Regions:
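Ligand-binding pockets and gating/stacking loops
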Residues: 1-327
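Conserved small/polar residues in nucleotide/adenosyl-binding loops
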Residues: 328-334
Length: 338
């Protein structure tokens, strides 16, 4: 999971969402530029989407799909005027505290987070309120069904956030099943891949289909890149009877909208589905292609740290031009749902 997000399998490198917001900034100053939507906490926890050595203002706001944002509502005894006065006093104190500590980036980011939280009190609840959608829309996403409710809500939230200028939204579904119930069953089919994948696939199939249709009907799909995938595939040989083991040597991801050529496919595995043998794509290639579609040259998006320039694709990565509608030079999509 770390490698799919940051290009490296070790902690400490920035996640792709942080790189994108570092490169493109945010379109809505009242909402975060990078949002993570999850049910159960994915294996690896928060480090998999951390900003690494990038300034902490590029870290995501992580939101539980069943309990969106905690501690966002101010106390009933405090009105907007009094809260603004309180924050102004806090800002003045922080300024005095921060002047001799101007090189402490984490401190500056922490101070900035208070202001963002204040602005989010108005913008975030409205953006996250799935109940503002029509009954027909909620049913299309599967919000009314137990199996699809969690991912359906996440997909609606993602569309609403993108609609309001959030630059990068990342959804996690079927991560570990730790208390998530049927709606968050993991894709880890070691014992019975048939039963496991039927449930896991059902939880995402209707919601993601509805998201694509919804984005297209609203004229948003051409400006929004949607990326769907995991971190590895499964072996073709049996494990524990009906199960399948992990297989990082060959697996599938798909992309839609945002300059992707519909119906195109790239790469192939051997006859056993065990190993990629034709037009192999690395994680660096995937990241280079995503950044290209968002208008970013992956070789020029760099950050100086520990004596050298770092980038998401490190020293590798090539754009997969064969899956693009055209070789973009301008008028690029600027939002991403992963």
């Amino acid at each position: 999971m770390l490698e799919m997000n940051s290009g490296m399998f070790l902690q400490g490198r920035p996640a792709m969402g942080s790189w994108v917001t570092y490169g493109l900034g945010s379109e809505n100053q009242n909402l975060p530029g990078f949002v993570v939507l999850h049910g159960s906490m994915p294996r690896g926890g928060k480090p998999i989407w951390a900003p690494g050595f990038l300034p902490k203002k590029f870290q995501p706001t992580a939101i539980n799909g069943t309990n969106p944002i905690g501690n966002l509502t101010r106390r009933k005894s405090m009105d907007d005027q009094h809260q603004r006065a309180q924050l102004d006093i806090l800002r003045a104190m922080n300024r005095v505290h921060g002047e001799p500590r101007s090189l402490e980036r984490d401190l500056a980011a922490r101070i900035e987070s208070f202001e963002l939280a204040y602005r989010m009190q108005t913008a975030a609840p409205e953006a996250m309120d799935v109940n503002q959608e029509s009954k027909a829309t909620q049913q299309a996403y599967g919000v009314d069904q137990k199996e699809t409710q969690l991912v359906g809500r996440q997909c609606i939230m993602a569309r609403r956030l993108i609609e309001r200028g959030v630059r990068f939204v990342q959804l996690y579904a079927g991560t570990n099943g730790g208390g998530g119930g049927v709606a968050d069953v993991p894709w880890d089919g070691h014992n019975d891949i048939g039963a496991n994948h039927r449930i896991a696939a059902k939880s995402v199939d209707q919601p993601i289909g509805a998201l694509l249709s919804d984005l297209k009907s609203r004229g948003m799909l051409e400006d929004t890149l949607v990326v769907w995938g995991g971190e590895f595939g499964r072996t073709s040989d049996a494990q524990s009877g009906k199960g399948r083991d992990h297989n990082p040597n060959a697996f599938t991801m798909w992309m839609a909208g945002g300059g992707i050529k519909g119906g195109a496919h790239y790469g192939a595995s051997d006859e056993f589905g065990y190993k990629a043998v034709e037009n192999r794509v690395s994680v660096n290639d995937l990241h280079a292609t995503i950044l290209h579609l968002l208008g970013i040259d992956h070789e020029r998006l760099t950050y100086f740290f520990n004596g050298r320039d770092f980038r998401l694709t490190d020293v590798a990565g090539k754009v997969i031009n064969e899956i693009l509608c055209l070789l973009y030079t301008s008028d690029l999509p600027t939002n991403c749902v992963v």
